Protein backbone atom coordinates (compact mmCIF):
# COMPACT_ATOMS: atom_id res chain seq x y z
CA UNK A 1 0.00 0.00 0.00
CA UNK A 2 1.47 3.36 -1.04
CA UNK A 3 1.85 6.06 1.62
CA UNK A 4 -0.28 9.17 1.28
CA UNK A 5 1.70 12.21 0.16
CA UNK A 6 1.31 15.24 2.40
CA UNK A 7 -0.27 18.14 0.49
CA UNK A 8 1.42 21.50 -0.05
CA UNK A 9 -0.81 24.57 0.18
CA UNK A 10 -0.18 27.91 -1.52
CA UNK A 11 -0.53 31.56 -0.54
CA UNK A 12 -2.96 33.49 -2.74
CA UNK A 13 -0.51 35.69 -4.66
CA UNK A 14 -0.13 34.89 -8.36
CA UNK A 15 3.33 34.83 -9.99
CA UNK A 16 4.99 34.56 -6.57
CA UNK A 17 7.76 31.98 -6.68
CA UNK A 18 7.34 28.79 -4.70
CA UNK A 19 10.01 29.64 -2.10
CA UNK A 20 7.75 32.45 -0.84
CA UNK A 21 4.38 30.85 -1.49
CA UNK A 22 4.29 27.19 -0.50
CA UNK A 23 3.00 26.09 2.91
CA UNK A 24 3.51 22.34 3.45
CA UNK A 25 1.69 20.48 6.21
CA UNK A 26 3.07 20.55 9.71
CA UNK A 27 3.64 24.27 10.17
CA UNK A 28 2.22 27.66 11.16
CA UNK A 29 2.49 30.76 8.97
CA UNK A 30 1.59 34.33 9.90
CA UNK A 31 0.69 37.32 7.69
CA UNK A 32 -0.08 40.78 9.12
CA UNK A 33 -2.26 43.12 7.05
CA UNK A 34 -2.65 46.87 7.46
CA UNK A 35 -6.32 46.82 6.40
CA UNK A 36 -9.25 44.51 7.08
CA UNK A 37 -10.37 44.46 3.43
CA UNK A 38 -6.90 43.42 2.28
CA UNK A 39 -6.90 40.57 4.79
CA UNK A 40 -10.27 39.27 3.56
CA UNK A 41 -9.22 39.61 -0.08
CA UNK A 42 -6.01 37.66 0.56
CA UNK A 43 -7.97 34.90 2.32
CA UNK A 44 -10.39 34.56 -0.61
CA UNK A 45 -7.60 34.30 -3.17
CA UNK A 46 -5.66 31.90 -0.96
CA UNK A 47 -8.71 29.62 -0.92
CA UNK A 48 -8.96 29.89 -4.70
CA UNK A 49 -5.28 28.94 -5.03
CA UNK A 50 -5.79 25.47 -3.52
CA UNK A 51 -6.50 22.31 -5.47
CA UNK A 52 -10.03 21.14 -6.15
CA UNK A 53 -9.90 18.35 -3.56
CA UNK A 54 -8.08 20.33 -0.84
CA UNK A 55 -9.48 20.29 2.67
CA UNK A 56 -9.84 23.92 3.71
CA UNK A 57 -11.41 25.42 6.82
CA UNK A 58 -11.74 29.11 7.69
CA UNK A 59 -12.09 30.30 11.29
CA UNK A 60 -13.35 33.85 11.79
CA UNK A 61 -13.40 35.97 14.94
CA UNK A 62 -15.66 38.82 13.82
CA UNK A 63 -19.20 38.25 12.58
CA UNK A 64 -20.29 35.52 10.20
CA UNK A 65 -17.41 34.39 7.93
CA UNK A 66 -19.97 33.20 5.38
CA UNK A 67 -20.73 36.85 4.53
CA UNK A 68 -17.14 37.70 3.53
CA UNK A 69 -15.70 34.39 2.31
CA UNK A 70 -16.42 33.76 -1.37
CA UNK A 71 -15.69 30.62 -3.37
CA UNK A 72 -14.35 30.93 -6.92
CA UNK A 73 -16.47 28.85 -9.31
CA UNK A 74 -13.51 28.00 -11.55
CA UNK A 75 -10.70 27.73 -9.00
CA UNK A 76 -10.15 26.19 -5.61
CA UNK A 77 -12.13 23.60 -3.65
CA UNK A 78 -15.83 23.09 -4.23
CA UNK A 79 -16.64 23.51 -0.56
CA UNK A 80 -14.92 24.59 2.64
CA UNK A 81 -15.71 24.44 6.34
CA UNK A 82 -16.54 27.69 8.15
CA UNK A 83 -16.18 28.22 11.89
CA UNK A 84 -16.54 31.15 14.28
CA UNK A 85 -14.73 31.65 17.56
CA UNK A 86 -14.74 34.29 20.31
CA UNK A 87 -12.24 37.11 20.21
CA UNK A 88 -10.52 36.19 23.47
CA UNK A 89 -7.35 34.59 24.79
CA UNK A 90 -9.33 31.64 26.15
CA UNK A 91 -10.85 31.07 22.72
CA UNK A 92 -7.37 30.88 21.17
CA UNK A 93 -6.19 28.28 23.66
CA UNK A 94 -9.37 26.22 23.08
CA UNK A 95 -9.02 26.33 19.28
CA UNK A 96 -7.20 22.96 18.78
CA UNK A 97 -9.66 21.09 21.00
CA UNK A 98 -12.69 22.72 19.35
CA UNK A 99 -11.45 21.82 15.86
CA UNK A 100 -10.90 18.19 16.85
CA UNK A 101 -14.56 18.03 17.90
CA UNK A 102 -15.68 19.01 14.39
CA UNK A 103 -13.17 17.71 11.82
CA UNK A 104 -10.33 15.27 11.38
CA UNK A 105 -7.48 17.79 11.00
CA UNK A 106 -5.15 15.51 9.03
CA UNK A 107 -4.14 17.17 5.72
CA UNK A 108 -6.36 20.16 6.47
CA UNK A 109 -5.49 23.76 5.67
CA UNK A 110 -6.83 26.02 8.44
CA UNK A 111 -7.02 29.79 7.90
CA UNK A 112 -7.56 31.87 11.04
CA UNK A 113 -8.84 35.42 10.40
CA UNK A 114 -8.17 37.44 13.54
CA UNK A 115 -10.26 40.38 14.64
CA UNK A 116 -8.76 43.85 14.41
CA UNK A 117 -6.00 44.22 17.02
CA UNK A 118 -6.77 40.86 18.63
CA UNK A 119 -3.26 40.53 20.01
CA UNK A 120 -2.99 44.01 21.51
CA UNK A 121 -3.85 42.91 25.05
CA UNK A 122 -2.15 39.51 24.88
CA UNK A 123 1.33 39.41 26.37
CA UNK A 124 4.33 38.26 24.37
CA UNK A 125 4.74 35.33 26.77
CA UNK A 126 1.15 34.16 26.12
CA UNK A 127 1.66 34.59 22.38
CA UNK A 128 4.84 32.49 22.56
CA UNK A 129 3.05 29.69 24.41
CA UNK A 130 0.13 29.70 21.97
CA UNK A 131 2.40 29.53 18.91
CA UNK A 132 4.41 26.73 20.49
CA UNK A 133 1.20 24.81 21.17
CA UNK A 134 -0.16 25.31 17.63
CA UNK A 135 3.18 24.29 16.11
CA UNK A 136 3.14 20.97 17.97
CA UNK A 137 -0.52 20.45 17.09
CA UNK A 138 -0.06 21.01 13.34
CA UNK A 139 2.99 18.73 13.22
CA UNK A 140 1.21 15.96 15.10
CA UNK A 141 -1.90 16.08 12.89
CA UNK A 142 -0.08 16.82 9.58
CA UNK A 143 -2.05 19.99 8.89
CA UNK A 144 -1.24 23.65 8.22
CA UNK A 145 -2.37 26.87 9.89
CA UNK A 146 -2.26 30.30 8.26
CA UNK A 147 -2.93 33.23 10.61
CA UNK A 148 -4.16 36.39 8.88
CA UNK A 149 -3.94 39.26 11.34
CA UNK A 150 -5.37 42.68 10.39
CA UNK A 151 -3.89 45.33 12.68
CA UNK A 152 -3.08 49.02 12.55
CA UNK A 153 0.41 48.54 14.00
CA UNK A 154 1.95 45.71 12.00
CA UNK A 155 5.48 46.90 12.76
CA UNK A 156 5.01 46.29 16.47
CA UNK A 157 3.39 42.90 15.88
CA UNK A 158 6.16 41.84 13.48
CA UNK A 159 8.82 42.86 16.00
CA UNK A 160 7.19 40.66 18.64
CA UNK A 161 7.13 37.70 16.23
CA UNK A 162 10.67 38.00 14.85
CA UNK A 163 12.03 35.74 17.56
CA UNK A 164 9.36 33.04 17.09
CA UNK A 165 11.15 31.29 14.21
CA UNK A 166 11.11 27.99 16.13
CA UNK A 167 7.30 27.97 16.16
CA UNK A 168 6.54 29.95 12.99
CA UNK A 169 7.51 28.68 9.55
CA UNK A 170 6.77 32.03 7.93
CA UNK A 171 6.22 35.67 8.87
CA UNK A 172 5.22 38.42 6.45
CA UNK A 173 3.28 41.70 6.32
CA UNK A 174 0.95 43.08 3.67
CA UNK A 175 1.45 46.84 3.81
CA UNK A 176 -0.83 49.39 2.15
CA UNK A 177 1.09 52.32 0.65
CA UNK A 178 -1.64 54.46 -0.87
CA UNK A 179 -1.52 53.44 -4.53
CA UNK A 180 0.24 50.10 -4.12
CA UNK A 181 0.85 47.23 -1.70
CA UNK A 182 4.13 45.91 -0.36
CA UNK A 183 4.62 42.28 0.65
CA UNK A 184 7.30 42.42 3.35
CA UNK A 185 8.70 38.96 4.11
CA UNK A 186 10.62 38.64 7.37
CA UNK A 187 11.25 34.91 6.80
CA UNK A 188 9.54 32.05 4.96
CA UNK A 189 10.51 28.39 5.30
CA UNK A 190 9.17 25.48 3.26
CA UNK A 191 10.30 22.45 1.25
CA UNK A 192 12.10 24.78 -1.21
CA UNK A 193 14.37 26.32 1.41
CA UNK A 194 14.48 29.44 3.58
CA UNK A 195 14.02 33.03 2.36
CA UNK A 196 14.30 36.17 4.47
CA UNK A 197 14.22 39.97 4.32
CA UNK A 198 12.54 40.45 0.99
CA UNK A 199 10.08 43.12 -0.07
CA UNK A 200 7.92 42.74 -3.16
CA UNK A 201 5.46 45.11 -4.81
CA UNK A 202 2.00 43.65 -5.38
CA UNK A 203 -0.85 44.61 -7.68
CA UNK A 204 -4.51 44.08 -6.81
CA UNK A 205 -6.93 43.87 -9.71
CA UNK A 206 -10.44 42.43 -9.59
CA UNK A 207 -9.83 41.12 -6.06
CA UNK A 208 -6.77 39.19 -7.29
CA UNK A 209 -3.26 39.63 -5.93
CA UNK A 210 -0.38 39.40 -8.38
CA UNK A 211 3.30 40.16 -8.27
CA UNK A 212 4.20 43.44 -9.93
CA UNK A 213 5.79 42.98 -13.36
CA UNK A 214 8.89 44.87 -12.31
CA UNK A 215 9.38 42.42 -9.44
CA UNK A 216 9.12 39.26 -11.55
CA UNK A 217 12.64 39.68 -12.90
CA UNK A 218 14.14 41.90 -10.19
CA UNK A 219 16.89 40.33 -8.12
CA UNK A 220 16.85 41.11 -4.43
CA UNK A 221 20.09 42.88 -3.44
CA UNK A 222 22.49 40.66 -1.54
CA UNK A 223 24.98 43.31 -0.48
CA UNK A 224 24.26 47.03 -0.17
CA UNK A 225 27.01 47.74 2.32
CA UNK A 226 28.33 50.75 0.39
CA UNK A 227 24.95 52.49 0.16
CA UNK A 228 24.35 55.52 2.38
CA UNK A 229 20.74 56.68 2.76
CA UNK A 230 20.69 60.09 4.40
CA UNK A 231 18.44 63.00 5.30
CA UNK A 232 19.34 65.98 3.13
CA UNK A 233 20.01 68.17 6.20
CA UNK A 234 22.90 65.96 7.28
CA UNK A 235 25.16 67.32 4.51
CA UNK A 236 24.20 70.94 5.34
CA UNK A 237 23.51 71.91 1.74
CA UNK A 238 26.36 69.96 0.14
CA UNK A 239 25.55 67.67 -2.82
CA UNK A 240 25.78 63.86 -2.53
CA UNK A 241 29.42 62.96 -1.95
CA UNK A 242 29.43 59.96 -4.31
CA UNK A 243 27.17 57.69 -6.32
CA UNK A 244 26.59 55.64 -3.16
CA UNK A 245 24.79 58.51 -1.40
CA UNK A 246 21.00 58.95 -1.67
CA UNK A 247 19.37 61.98 -0.05
CA UNK A 248 15.79 62.27 1.24
CA UNK A 249 13.77 65.34 2.20
CA UNK A 250 12.32 63.88 5.40
CA UNK A 251 12.83 61.02 7.83
CA UNK A 252 9.62 59.24 6.78
CA UNK A 253 10.73 58.85 3.15
CA UNK A 254 14.15 57.75 4.37
CA UNK A 255 12.56 55.16 6.67
CA UNK A 256 10.37 53.71 3.92
CA UNK A 257 13.36 53.27 1.61
CA UNK A 258 15.47 51.79 4.41
CA UNK A 259 12.93 48.98 4.84
CA UNK A 260 14.59 47.19 1.91
CA UNK A 261 18.17 47.71 3.11
CA UNK A 262 20.31 44.94 4.55
CA UNK A 263 23.73 46.40 5.37
CA UNK A 264 23.46 50.03 4.26
CA UNK A 265 24.10 53.11 6.39
CA UNK A 266 20.95 55.01 7.42
CA UNK A 267 21.38 58.60 8.68
CA UNK A 268 18.37 60.30 10.28
CA UNK A 269 18.19 64.00 11.12
CA UNK A 270 16.89 65.36 14.43
CA UNK A 271 15.89 69.00 14.84
CA UNK A 272 13.10 69.03 17.46
CA UNK A 273 12.41 67.32 20.76
CA UNK A 274 9.00 66.07 19.58
CA UNK A 275 10.70 64.00 16.86
CA UNK A 276 12.42 61.73 19.36
CA UNK A 277 9.67 59.16 20.01
CA UNK A 278 8.64 58.72 16.32
CA UNK A 279 12.31 58.41 15.40
CA UNK A 280 12.85 55.85 18.16
CA UNK A 281 9.98 53.75 16.80
CA UNK A 282 11.44 53.85 13.28
CA UNK A 283 14.90 52.85 14.50
CA UNK A 284 13.43 50.02 16.59
CA UNK A 285 11.46 48.72 13.59
CA UNK A 286 14.50 48.77 11.30
CA UNK A 287 16.76 47.09 13.83
CA UNK A 288 14.27 44.34 14.68
CA UNK A 289 13.23 43.65 11.08
CA UNK A 290 16.35 44.33 9.00
CA UNK A 291 19.01 42.82 11.23
CA UNK A 292 22.35 43.67 12.79
CA UNK A 293 24.30 44.55 9.62
CA UNK A 294 22.37 47.80 9.16
CA UNK A 295 24.24 50.92 10.35
CA UNK A 296 21.83 53.46 11.87
CA UNK A 297 23.13 56.94 12.69
CA UNK A 298 21.25 59.92 14.16
CA UNK A 299 22.57 63.39 13.32
CA UNK A 300 21.45 66.05 15.81
CA UNK A 301 21.22 69.18 13.63
CA UNK A 302 19.83 71.38 16.43
CA UNK A 303 20.48 70.83 20.14
CA UNK A 304 17.44 68.87 21.32
CA UNK A 305 18.65 65.65 23.00
CA UNK A 306 18.90 64.99 26.72
CA UNK A 307 20.93 62.11 28.11
CA UNK A 308 17.76 60.03 28.48
CA UNK A 309 16.83 60.64 24.85
CA UNK A 310 20.26 59.52 23.67
CA UNK A 311 19.94 56.39 25.78
CA UNK A 312 16.51 55.68 24.26
CA UNK A 313 17.74 55.98 20.65
CA UNK A 314 20.78 53.83 21.34
CA UNK A 315 18.61 51.26 23.11
CA UNK A 316 16.28 51.10 20.11
CA UNK A 317 19.16 50.11 17.84
CA UNK A 318 21.09 53.20 16.73
CA UNK A 319 24.82 52.62 16.21
CA UNK A 320 25.80 56.23 16.88
CA UNK A 321 24.45 59.69 17.69
CA UNK A 322 26.38 62.63 16.27
CA UNK A 323 26.01 65.76 18.47
CA UNK A 324 24.79 69.07 17.10
CA UNK A 325 28.09 70.88 17.65
CA UNK A 326 30.15 68.47 15.55
CA UNK A 327 31.22 70.16 12.27
CA UNK A 328 30.46 68.50 8.93
CA UNK A 329 34.00 67.20 8.55
CA UNK A 330 33.81 65.52 11.96
CA UNK A 331 30.33 64.19 11.12
CA UNK A 332 31.61 62.49 7.95
CA UNK A 333 34.53 60.97 9.85
CA UNK A 334 32.14 59.48 12.42
CA UNK A 335 29.91 58.09 9.65
CA UNK A 336 32.96 56.46 8.10
CA UNK A 337 33.89 54.92 11.45
CA UNK A 338 30.72 52.77 11.63
CA UNK A 339 31.35 51.08 8.27
CA UNK A 340 31.72 47.33 8.63
CA UNK A 341 30.25 47.28 12.12
CA UNK A 342 27.84 44.61 13.33
CA UNK A 343 25.28 45.76 15.89
CA UNK A 344 25.69 43.49 18.91
CA UNK A 345 23.53 45.02 21.66
CA UNK A 346 20.23 43.43 22.64
CA UNK A 347 17.09 45.27 21.50
CA UNK A 348 13.85 44.34 23.35
CA UNK A 349 11.07 43.15 21.08
CA UNK A 350 8.53 45.56 22.61
CA UNK A 351 9.43 49.24 22.29
CA UNK A 352 7.21 50.19 25.24
CA UNK A 353 9.85 48.59 27.45
CA UNK A 354 12.37 51.06 26.08
CA UNK A 355 10.02 54.03 26.23
CA UNK A 356 9.40 53.36 29.92
CA UNK A 357 13.13 53.89 30.50
CA UNK A 358 12.89 57.60 29.66
CA UNK A 359 10.44 58.41 32.47
CA UNK A 360 10.47 55.56 35.00
CA UNK A 361 9.49 58.05 37.72
CA UNK A 362 6.07 59.55 37.04
CA UNK A 363 6.51 61.96 39.95
CA UNK A 364 7.64 65.55 40.28
CA UNK A 365 8.08 68.00 43.12
CA UNK A 366 7.59 67.44 46.84
CA UNK A 367 6.92 63.90 48.09
CA UNK A 368 6.47 62.64 51.66
CA UNK A 369 9.61 61.05 53.12
CA UNK A 370 8.43 57.41 52.74
CA UNK A 371 7.08 57.96 49.21
CA UNK A 372 10.39 59.57 48.26
CA UNK A 373 12.36 56.57 49.54
CA UNK A 374 10.06 54.06 47.80
CA UNK A 375 10.35 55.90 44.48
CA UNK A 376 14.15 55.90 44.56
CA UNK A 377 14.23 52.23 45.59
CA UNK A 378 12.06 51.36 42.57
CA UNK A 379 14.44 53.32 40.35
CA UNK A 380 17.51 51.56 41.74
CA UNK A 381 15.85 48.15 41.27
CA UNK A 382 15.07 48.74 37.59
CA UNK A 383 17.53 46.47 35.73
CA UNK A 384 16.73 48.09 32.38
CA UNK A 385 18.32 51.36 33.49
CA UNK A 386 22.08 51.85 33.12
CA UNK A 387 24.33 51.16 36.07
CA UNK A 388 25.50 54.29 37.90
CA UNK A 389 23.48 56.46 35.55
CA UNK A 390 20.06 56.57 37.15
CA UNK A 391 20.45 59.99 38.73
CA UNK A 392 21.95 62.05 41.53
CA UNK A 393 20.85 62.20 45.18
CA UNK A 394 21.61 65.53 46.91
CA UNK A 395 21.16 66.44 50.59
CA UNK A 396 21.16 70.18 51.38
CA UNK A 397 21.28 71.76 54.85
CA UNK A 398 20.06 75.40 55.01
CA UNK A 399 22.15 78.23 56.44
CA UNK A 400 21.39 79.43 60.00
CA UNK A 401 18.33 81.63 60.04
CA UNK A 402 16.50 79.76 57.26
CA UNK A 403 14.19 76.91 58.13
CA UNK A 404 14.22 73.87 55.86
CA UNK A 405 10.51 74.47 55.17
CA UNK A 406 11.36 77.95 53.90
CA UNK A 407 14.14 76.57 51.69
CA UNK A 408 11.62 74.13 50.23
CA UNK A 409 9.52 77.02 48.90
CA UNK A 410 12.49 78.05 46.74
CA UNK A 411 12.89 74.55 45.22
CA UNK A 412 11.04 74.49 41.88
CA UNK A 413 11.92 71.46 39.71
CA UNK A 414 10.51 71.50 36.19
CA UNK A 415 11.32 67.99 34.93
CA UNK A 416 9.21 64.90 35.54
CA UNK A 417 11.32 62.58 37.67
CA UNK A 418 12.91 65.34 39.78
CA UNK A 419 11.54 64.94 43.32
CA UNK A 420 12.38 66.29 46.77
CA UNK A 421 11.48 65.81 50.41
CA UNK A 422 12.42 67.30 53.79
CA UNK A 423 13.34 65.67 57.09
CA UNK A 424 16.02 65.83 59.75
CA UNK A 425 16.62 69.52 58.94
CA UNK A 426 17.69 68.57 55.41
CA UNK A 427 16.25 69.14 51.96
CA UNK A 428 16.87 65.97 49.91
CA UNK A 429 16.65 66.07 46.11
CA UNK A 430 16.74 63.25 43.57
CA UNK A 431 17.40 64.35 39.98
CA UNK A 432 16.66 61.42 37.67
CA UNK A 433 19.18 60.77 34.87
CA UNK A 434 21.20 63.83 35.85
CA UNK A 435 24.96 63.46 35.43
CA UNK A 436 27.04 64.49 38.41
CA UNK A 437 29.05 66.94 36.31
CA UNK A 438 25.77 68.68 35.37
CA UNK A 439 24.58 68.98 38.96
CA UNK A 440 25.47 72.66 39.45
CA UNK A 441 23.69 73.60 36.23
CA UNK A 442 20.60 71.64 37.30
CA UNK A 443 20.52 73.28 40.75
CA UNK A 444 20.81 76.73 39.19
CA UNK A 445 17.67 75.97 37.16
CA UNK A 446 15.79 74.64 40.19
CA UNK A 447 16.60 77.42 42.70
CA UNK A 448 16.09 81.13 41.88
CA UNK A 449 18.99 82.10 44.19
CA UNK A 450 22.56 80.76 44.33
CA UNK A 451 22.56 77.57 46.39
CA UNK A 452 25.56 78.85 48.35
CA UNK A 453 23.38 81.65 49.74
CA UNK A 454 20.64 79.26 50.85
CA UNK A 455 22.51 76.16 52.02
CA UNK A 456 25.59 75.76 54.16
CA UNK A 457 26.26 72.08 53.51
CA UNK A 458 25.80 69.77 50.51
CA UNK A 459 26.28 66.02 50.18
CA UNK A 460 26.05 64.19 46.83
CA UNK A 461 25.60 60.50 45.92
CA UNK A 462 25.64 59.44 42.25
CA UNK A 463 26.65 55.75 42.15
CA UNK A 464 24.01 53.06 42.61
CA UNK A 465 25.71 51.57 45.67
CA UNK A 466 26.11 54.97 47.29
CA UNK A 467 22.46 55.91 46.70
CA UNK A 468 21.21 52.53 47.96
CA UNK A 469 23.34 52.79 51.10
CA UNK A 470 22.08 56.30 51.84
CA UNK A 471 18.53 55.11 51.20
CA UNK A 472 18.94 52.57 54.02
CA UNK A 473 19.97 55.38 56.37
CA UNK A 474 17.06 57.57 55.27
CA UNK A 475 14.55 54.83 56.09
CA UNK A 476 15.85 54.79 59.68
CA UNK A 477 14.66 58.36 60.26
CA UNK A 478 11.69 58.32 62.61
CA UNK A 479 8.40 59.74 61.26
CA UNK A 480 8.47 62.47 63.94
CA UNK A 481 11.42 64.04 62.12
CA UNK A 482 9.76 63.99 58.69
CA UNK A 483 9.07 67.50 57.49
CA UNK A 484 5.96 68.96 55.92
CA UNK A 485 5.68 71.98 53.61
CA UNK A 486 4.51 75.31 54.95
CA UNK A 487 0.76 75.91 54.59
CA UNK A 488 -0.23 77.95 51.60
CA UNK A 489 -0.59 81.63 52.42
CA UNK A 490 -3.92 83.28 51.81
CA UNK A 491 -3.99 85.26 48.64
CA UNK A 492 -3.73 88.99 49.34
CA UNK A 493 -6.62 91.19 48.31
CA UNK A 494 -5.96 92.84 44.97
CA UNK A 495 -5.01 96.52 45.03
CA UNK A 496 -7.91 98.38 43.48
CA UNK A 497 -6.70 101.96 43.88
CA UNK A 498 -3.95 101.64 41.26
CA UNK A 499 -3.73 101.98 37.51
CA UNK A 500 -1.11 101.25 34.85
CA UNK A 501 -0.10 104.20 32.71
CA UNK A 502 1.64 102.08 30.07
CA UNK A 503 4.99 102.10 31.85
CA UNK A 504 4.47 101.57 35.58
CA UNK A 505 1.71 101.05 38.12
CA UNK A 506 0.56 104.23 39.93
CA UNK A 507 -1.53 104.35 43.09
CA UNK A 508 -4.58 106.57 42.95
CA UNK A 509 -4.84 108.78 46.06
CA UNK A 510 -7.94 108.06 48.07
CA UNK A 511 -9.32 111.01 50.10
CA UNK A 512 -9.90 110.40 53.81
CA UNK A 513 -11.74 112.65 56.30
CA UNK A 514 -10.19 112.77 59.71
CA UNK A 515 -13.40 114.06 61.34
CA UNK A 516 -16.95 113.24 60.35
CA UNK A 517 -19.85 115.73 60.42
CA UNK A 518 -20.95 114.73 63.95
CA UNK A 519 -17.51 115.42 65.42
CA UNK A 520 -17.35 118.83 63.70
CA UNK A 521 -20.73 119.95 65.14
CA UNK A 522 -19.74 118.77 68.61
CA UNK A 523 -16.66 120.95 68.50
From Swiss-Prot:
Keywords: Cellulose biosynthesis, Nucleotide-binding. This is Cyclic di-GMP binding protein BcsE. The keyword Nucleotide-binding applies. One of its GO terms (biological process) is cellulose biosynthetic process. Disruption phenotype: Produces much less cellulose, and the timing cellulose synthesis and structure of the fibers may be altered. Deletion can be complemented by the protein from S.typhimurium LT2 or E.coli, however the 'D-415' mutation in the E.coli protein does not complement. Disulfide bonds: none annotated. It holds the Pfam family CBP_BcsE.
Amino acid sequence: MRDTVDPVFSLGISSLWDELRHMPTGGVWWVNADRQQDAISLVNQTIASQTENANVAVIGMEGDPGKVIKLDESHGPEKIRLFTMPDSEKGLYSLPHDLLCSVNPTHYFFILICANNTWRNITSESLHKWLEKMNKWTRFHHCSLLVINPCNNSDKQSSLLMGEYRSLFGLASLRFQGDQHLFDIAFWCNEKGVSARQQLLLCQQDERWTLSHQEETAIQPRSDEKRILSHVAVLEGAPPLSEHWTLFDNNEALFNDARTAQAATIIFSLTQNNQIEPLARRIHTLRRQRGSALKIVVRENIASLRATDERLLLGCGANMIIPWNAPLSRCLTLIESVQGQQFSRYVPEDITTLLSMTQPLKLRGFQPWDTFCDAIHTMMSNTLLPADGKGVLVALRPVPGIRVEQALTLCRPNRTGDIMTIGGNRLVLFLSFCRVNDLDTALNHIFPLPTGDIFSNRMVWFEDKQISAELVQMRLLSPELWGTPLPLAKRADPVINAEHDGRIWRRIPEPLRLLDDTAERAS
